[in-house]
């Protein structure tokens, strides 16, 4: 598996994450994640096929944001959070899977820092 470059825009409202690969001469679109509001994600696959998903809750069941909308912050963390051997991308209170689909959304909005670690060693996973 080759690494991709991920470009991200949006902290306080809409959140866009765009993954591209380099084929040796140019950037090639891999996927685009667009959290366009608190409950809607538009996803474009490698062929620009669009799917739209609606969310009515987030991962923790608290907070007001169900997608990456309004959950951004000023840095990005990358790691294999779900144990599938591929890295996920976290911006603020939301994580996008390696295919650009929303994986987690805590829903507490804009934070100032990200700390990803095995904070509870007795609990499986991160």
Which ranges hold each PLM region?
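Beta-propeller-forming repeat regions
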Residues: 1-126
């Amino acid at each position: 598996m080759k690494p991709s470059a991920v470009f991200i825009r949006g902290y306080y409202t809409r959140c866009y994450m765009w993954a591209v690969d380099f084929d040796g001469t140019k950037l090639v679109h891999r996927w685009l994640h667009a959290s366009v509001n608190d409950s809607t994600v538009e996803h474009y696959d490698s062929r620009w096929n669009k799917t739209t998903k609606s969310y009515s809750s987030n991962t923790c069941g608290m907070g007001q944001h169900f997608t990456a909308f309004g959950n951004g912050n000023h840095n990005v963390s990358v790691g294999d959070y779900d144990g599938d051997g591929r890295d996920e991308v976290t911006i603020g209170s939301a994580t996008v899977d390696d295919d650009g689909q929303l994986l987690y959304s805590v829903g507490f909005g804009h934070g100032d820092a990200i700390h990803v670690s095995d904070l509870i060693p007795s609990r499986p996973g991160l």
